[in-house]
């Protein structure tokens, strides 16, 4: 009787981990392209770490030299301009993928895997923190004033706020000490993100992926490789194609022109605003006339994602077969787009009023509308079960 050779990827202590994650992983056969964004986020993180390391080799974290060192990277370092453009626009692609990933999670009820969802929300918050401290590093006008305005919000905390701000700044204003520590945070956080990503994947593999039907995935599963590995590679090609097109043809389209001006503490820009992917949260912050209230609203705008698993009242997992919930979901997306636009507008009438309405709608959808609709749709399904036919007049 001949001895069957063992496959090393299945028996090796280290390779077997990769095998169970990327090769022999049982995956639902019917997952759509919306399930691609997790792997795209991994690609974005790897790309950001590689380009970031190359940039860090030439960057100088000093208020006198930071701006010049970024110019030096673009002008004198071989392909430095490309690394800088890929890193800056890679952040935008990162957040596009994050928002698509979160949107898919809300639509298809992925948040019911509570551990995976909670780690994901922490990942989102850490990514936002990483992007914020990174935006300060070029030491342009918007870098300096963005850092000043956003960090100064912490002073709204009762009793300890002012002390925390001075401690964070390393002085009584945003200075060289602030830039040095922000560079340190920006360097270390992506590696923490990578570790958290492994925890995120570990929790996901405890339950397995959900699927577009919202039913038990164990009925029909196939191995990850070659089916979904090739599907992911197609996503990689599309993402990299878009990223390179932006980086080569319109590298500054998503940036802020004021950041090409050296930071000047004596001259405030006409409109202080963050990068486009934070504008919705910035709009919510500005919608509250009270400083502390604005900070609470800003934190709540992201942390509200943590309550979704507990406000889920529907008998169905996702929104695939729930017309009312679908309409509300797309109203939420439109509301976020409106908040993003409003965040870039001046803080004056009518924009402030529009922002307050849009912010109220945002919170109401999560806290009230989704739970109430879940309850109503349960009642409608019960009625249709008793009568033998679905009463569409109750839906539309």
Swiss-Prot record:
Q: What is its main location?
A: mitochondrion
Q: Which cofactor does it need?
A: heme b
Membrane topology per record: Multi-pass membrane protein
Positions that bind heme b b566: 101, 200
Claim: Kinase is one of the keywords in the record: no
> What terms describe the molecular function in GO for this protein?
metal ion binding; ubiquinol-cytochrome-c reductase activity
Per UniProt, a ubiquinone binds at 205
Give the note describing cofactor binding and stoichiometry.
Binds 2 heme b groups non-covalently.
Cross-referenced InterPro entries? Cyt_b/b6_C, Cyt_b/b6_C_sf, Cyt_b/b6_N, Cytb/b6-like_sf, Cytochrome_b, Cytochrome_b_C_euk/bac, Cytochrome_b_N_euk/bac, Di-haem_cyt_TM
Q: Which domain of life is it from?
A: Eukaryota
Q: Where does heme b b562 bind?
A: 87, 186
Is Lyase set as a keyword in this record?
A: no
In which compartments does the protein localize?
Mitochondrion inner membrane
GO biological process entries: mitochondrial electron transport, ubiquinol to cytochrome c
Query: Which is one Gene Ontology cellular component term of this protein?
Result: mitochondrial inner membrane
Q: Which UniProt keywords apply?
A: Electron transport, Heme, Iron, Membrane, Metal-binding, Mitochondrion, Mitochondrion inner membrane, Respiratory chain, Transmembrane, Transmembrane helix, Transport, Ubiquinone
From the record, give the transmembrane residue ranges. Answer: 37-57, 81-102, 117-137, 182-202, 230-250, 292-312, 324-344, 351-371
Annotated function: Component of the ubiquinol-cytochrome c reductase complex (complex III or cytochrome b-c1 complex) that is part of the mitochondrial respiratory chain. The b-c1 complex mediates electron transfer from ubiquinol to cytochrome c. Contributes to the generation of a proton gradient across the mitochondrial membrane that is then used for ATP synthesis.
Tell me its family: Belongs to the cytochrome b family.
| Assembly notes | The cytochrome bc1 complex contains 3 respiratory subunits (MT-CYB, CYC1 and UQCRFS1), 2 core proteins (UQCRC1 and UQCRC2) and probably 6 low-molecular weight proteins.
Other noteworthy facts: Heme 1 (or BL or b562) is low-potential and absorbs at about 562 nm, and heme 2 (or BH or b566) is high-potential and absorbs at about 566 nm.
Q: What is this protein called?
A: Cytochrome b
Source organism of the structure: Petromyzon marinus (Sea lamprey)
Which gene is annotated as encoding this protein in its UniProt record? mt-cyb
């Amino acid at each position: 009787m001949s001895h069957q050779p063992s496959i090393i990827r299945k028996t090796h202590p280290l390779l077997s981990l990769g095998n169970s994650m990327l090769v022999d992983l049982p995956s639902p056969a019917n997952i759509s392209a919306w399930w691609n964004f997790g792997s795209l986020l991994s690609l974005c993180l790897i790309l950001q770490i590689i380009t970031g390391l190359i940039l860090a080799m030439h960057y100088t974290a000093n208020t006198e030299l930071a701006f010049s060192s970024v110019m030096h990277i673009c002008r004198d370092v071989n392909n430095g301009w490309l690394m800088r453009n890929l890193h800056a626009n890679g952040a935008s692609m990162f957040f596009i993928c994050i928002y698509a990933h979160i949107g898919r999670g809300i639509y298809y009820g992925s948040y019911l895997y509570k551990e995976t969802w909670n780690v994901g929300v922490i990942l989102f918050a850490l990514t936002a923190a990483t992007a914020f401290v990174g935006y300060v590093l070029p030491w342009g006008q918007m870098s300096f004033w963005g850092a000043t305005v956003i960090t100064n919000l912490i002073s709204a905390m009762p009793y300890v706020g002012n002390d925390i701000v001075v401690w964070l700044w390393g002085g009584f204003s945003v200075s060289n000490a602030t830039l040095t520590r922000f560079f340190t945070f920006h360097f270390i956080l992506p590696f923490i993100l990578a570790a958290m990503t492994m925890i995120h994947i570990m929790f996901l593999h405890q339950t397995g992926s959900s699927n577009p039907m919202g039913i038990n995935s164990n009925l029909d599963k196939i191995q990850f490789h070659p089916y979904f590995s090739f599907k992911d590679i197609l996503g990689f090609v599309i993402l990299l194609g878009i990223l390179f097109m932006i980086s080569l043809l319109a590298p500054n389209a998503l940036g802020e022109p004021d950041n090409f001006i050296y930071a000047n503490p004596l001259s405030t820009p006409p409109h202080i605003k963050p990068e486009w992917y934070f504008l919705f949260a910035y709009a919510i912050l500005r919608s509250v006339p009270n400083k502390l209230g604005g900070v609470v609203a800003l934190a709540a705008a992201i942390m509200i994602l943590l309550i979704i698993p507990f406000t889920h009242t529907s008998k169905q997992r996702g929104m695939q077969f729930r017309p009312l919930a679908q309409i509300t979901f797309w109203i939420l997306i439109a509301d976020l787009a409106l908040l993003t636009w409003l965040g870039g507008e001046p803080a004056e009438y009518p924009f402030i009023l529009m922002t307050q309405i849009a912010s109220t709608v945002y919170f109401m959808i999560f806290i009230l509308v989704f739970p109430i609709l879940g309850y109503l749709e349960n009642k409608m399904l019960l009625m249709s079960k008793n009568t033998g036919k679905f009463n569409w007049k109750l839906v539309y």
